[in-house]
């Protein structure tokens, strides 16, 4: 039985063990997947011990993605650009391969929704790790990206780093209000404090609105605000979570699961748990 785990802090809320359990049942793969509360002081030692004991792979979530990145021996292109990994695989020779499947999870969910068309005007809110993890796949999909971040310098540095991969620029809230967008993505963690970026209402009304965070009935602070502004096309990040997990599962087990089927089951379980 192949051993896997997701590492984070906090981690009790993670849906990943359930998602991978469903993937295993669906594909007939014999796997064990557990949640591990990472120790801020000893994370690297704990993770390397996990692999030394024979584990085949691990998912990494906040706040350890950058630290896990530094432990790897080989990297995917998306992982190198993000400078953070959410997926590690132990290779046959014992070395660690690092990937970042967040962006592919996002793009696959946007495709499922019919929201990923070439040359769209996309506004991304935030310039932190979540944004870094998705820029490369979005630019590969020929999205025209504008980044807003409260600290403009951070957004500018990110835009400069990814400029050679496609159209990307930065803007202030005032500049954003004078533009039009086809898709608006919230990649900030403000929702964890019950806050959101106050994007101009007319933009939310006309665009498709996507929040990387998720909640039962899509009741995230940003999506609640978007609905109040008249948004009619909106979605939370549960599909992105299941999607990135699907790409990690494929990396480990060499079989891509039916993501949509698992997403539907997860939504039903969350609905029934209310």
UniProtKB/Swiss-Prot annotation:
Gene3D superfamilies: Leucine Dehydrogenase, chain A, domain 1, NAD(P)-binding Rossmann-like Domain. Keywords: Amino-acid biosynthesis, Aromatic amino acid biosynthesis, NADP, Oxidoreductase. Shikimate binds at residues 14-16, 61, 86, 102, 214. GO terms for molecular function: NADP binding; shikimate 3-dehydrogenase (NADP+) activity. GO terms for cellular component: cytosol. The keyword Ion transport does not apply. The active site is at 65 (proton acceptor). CDD domains: NAD_bind_Shikimate_DH. Pathway: Metabolic intermediate biosynthesis; chorismate biosynthesis; chorismate from D-erythrose 4-phosphate and phosphoenolpyruvate: step 4/7. NADP(+) binds at residues 77, 126-130, 149-154, 212, 237. Its EC number is 1.1.1.25. Pfam families: Shikimate_DH, Shikimate_dh_N. The keyword Oxidoreductase applies. GO terms for biological process: amino acid biosynthetic process; aromatic amino acid family biosynthetic process; chorismate biosynthetic process; shikimate metabolic process. It catalyses: shikimate + NADP(+) = 3-dehydroshikimate + NADPH + H(+). Homodimer. Belongs to the shikimate dehydrogenase family. Involved in the biosynthesis of the chorismate, which leads to the biosynthesis of aromatic amino acids. Catalyzes the reversible NADPH linked reduction of 3-dehydroshikimate (DHSA) to yield shikimate (SA). This is Shikimate dehydrogenase (NADP(+)). It comes from Actinobacillus pleuropneumoniae serotype 5b (strain L20). The lineage of its organism: Bacteria, Pseudomonadati, Pseudomonadota, Gammaproteobacteria, Pasteurellales.
